[in-house]
Regions:
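Conserved active-site and SAM-binding loop architecture
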Residues: 1-167
Length: 167
């Protein structure tokens, strides 16, 4: 029996990564922390779903930018060695016109840098991130710039990146 991978799920939504990983093997994957916050909502429905479905996880319902580095240090001390997340896609999505596309500079696109901040502090062995395929081409005025910036940010931290299309 191998070591359990301890997980921090960022931009957790209703827990898709948690369900997928734990369904594949509860002996291998254990989520310790999750973060879900909906800034424009009076109610935090996705967060409430997480509390109900996953009562043994520490749920953090605040803007990820407001999570102090000390919390990430705690996660590191508690053995978190994997970060997963589907960071907000609105600034890349086809639901937004290409003319109004802001990509990594948009209100939600900048949240990518919070993944980098958490990674810098926690230093996980692995990261699994997902986003819409339009991210690869954003912004339309400089196709692929944002994805290249993201790859460079992970490279600077010593991570190699694998890009896989979903099926």
């Amino acid at each position: 029996r191998g070591k359990v991978m301890k997980i921090f799920s960022m931009f957790d939504g209703v827990g898709g990564f948690i369900v997928g990983l734990e369904n594949s093997s509860k002996e291998v994957f254990q989520t310790l922390y999750s973060n879900q916050y909906e800034p424009s909502r009076k109610t935090q429905d996705a967060y409430e779903v997480g509390l109900y479905r996953f009562p043994d996880i520490e749920h953090i319902s605040t803007d990820v930018a407001l999570i102090p580095n000390e919390k990430f240090e705690e996660m590191k001390a508690n053995g978190v060695d994997m970060i997963v997340g589907g960071f907000p896609c609105q600034d890349y999505s086809v639901a937004r016109s290409k003319k109004n596309e802001l990509g990594i500079e948009g209100k939600k696109g900048v949240l990518f840098w919070e993944i980098i901040r958490a990674t810098e502090v926690i230093k996980p062995k692995y990261l699994i991130l997902e986003n819409v395929d339009r991210l690869l081409k954003a912004p339309s005025s400089q196709r692929g710039r944002d994805f290249a910036v993201m790859l460079a940010a992970f490279n600077e931290l010593g991570y190699s990146v694998e890009d896989r299309k979903s099926v």
